[in-house]
Every structure is written in C-alpha cells, then in structure tokens.
C-alpha cells in the first residue's frame, strides 16, 4: 500500500477528492488484498471497515470499523494540509491547519478513549471546528461504544464531549 499511496489515503489516490473516497478506497484495498492472497473473510472485514468510515455514508458496524473510524476521524493536524498556498484552503484545510496539537489517549481501566486538541482560534474558531467535525466526533463516540468505552473530547483544555 505504501508503494501505491505513500502519503495519501487509498481513496484519495484514485479520485484526488474527498467525495466517495471511502468507496474508492475499499475497492482499491480489495484488489490489493486479493492480489496478496488474503482470505476472503479477512479481506471482507477490512474492505467493509474502509467502506464504512466516511461520515456521509457509513458508520461503525463492528470493532474493526470502529477502530478505523476512531483512527481516521481523530487524525486532525496541521501536517495533513499539503498545500502551502493558503488561498487554496477549503474549510477542512483551515481546521486541520489550526490544530497545533492532537493526542489520542486510550485508558483501558477507565474504558475511555480521549482526544485532546489544541486549536489556534485565530485560525479557526471552535464553531468552525464543530461545524466540520461534530459528525466525525459522534462517529467516534459510537465507535467507542462498540468497544464498551466512552469517547471524550477536550479542546484547548475545556471538556467538550
């Protein structure tokens, strides 16, 4: 997979845009995993997780998809923004660019998955963050529930979820 997509998601390689990236990623992964002779049941689990990770079309259906969703939706950080030309940024780029620190912590004893963010509010307000990311955080909450855990979100030191 690294040879195919060293720094982009599989779906983004196929379609250089966000629309339908989960579905494209699932199709590409299925082809790659089949060529690697992965057993069908394992391949189906992975492809299903990839196909269900987008907030517009999916949701966690098992613990594998829950793990994928939590990993994907909590991956918010400045280095995700590829362009140096700020005039080309969309709202997703601005939100990612504004996050100066992001830590995902799992506490087994407390059965808690926590995302701690530091957001530069001169770049992106909390309202703008939640306008884009509220649905994603709700997906994380549901994914955490499949693990029997609670999802917590802290932004700039304030408990949000």
Go through each PLM region and give its residues.
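Catalytic Zn2+-binding segment of zinc metalloproteases
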Residues: 12-24
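An active-site-proximal "capping" alpha-helix that borders the catalytic cofactor pocket
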Residues: 21-36
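A broad detector of short, well-ordered amphipathic alpha-helices
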Residues: 23, 27, 45-48, 65, ...
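Single conserved hydrophobic/aromatic residue that forms the stacking wall/gate
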Residues: 1-10, 14
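Short, well-structured alpha-helical segments
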Residues: 2, 43-51
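Divalent metal-dependent phosphate-bond-processing catalytic cores, especially two-metal-ion Mg2+/Mn2+ enzymes
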Residues: 16, 35-38, 55-161
């Amino acid at each position: 997979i690294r040879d195919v997509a060293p720094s982009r998601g599989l779906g983004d390689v196929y379609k250089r845009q966000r629309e339908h990236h989960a579905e494209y990623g699932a199709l590409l992964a299925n082809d790659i995993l089949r060529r690697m002779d992965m057993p069908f049941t394992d391949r189906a689990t992975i492809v299903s997780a990839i196909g269900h990770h987008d907030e517009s079309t999916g949701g966690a259906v098992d613990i594998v998809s829950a793990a994928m969703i939590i990993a994907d939706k909590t991956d918010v950080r400045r280095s995700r923004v590829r362009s140096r030309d700020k005039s080309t940024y969309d709202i997703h780029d601005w939100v990612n660019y504004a996050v100066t620190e992001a830590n995902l912590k799992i506490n087994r004893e407390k059965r808690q998955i926590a995302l701690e963010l530091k957001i530069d509010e001169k770049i992106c307000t909390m309202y703008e963050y939640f306008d884009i990311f509220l649905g994603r955080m709700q997906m994380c909450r549901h994914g955490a529930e499949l693990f029997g855990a609670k999802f917590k979100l802290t932004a700039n030191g304030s408990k949000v979820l």
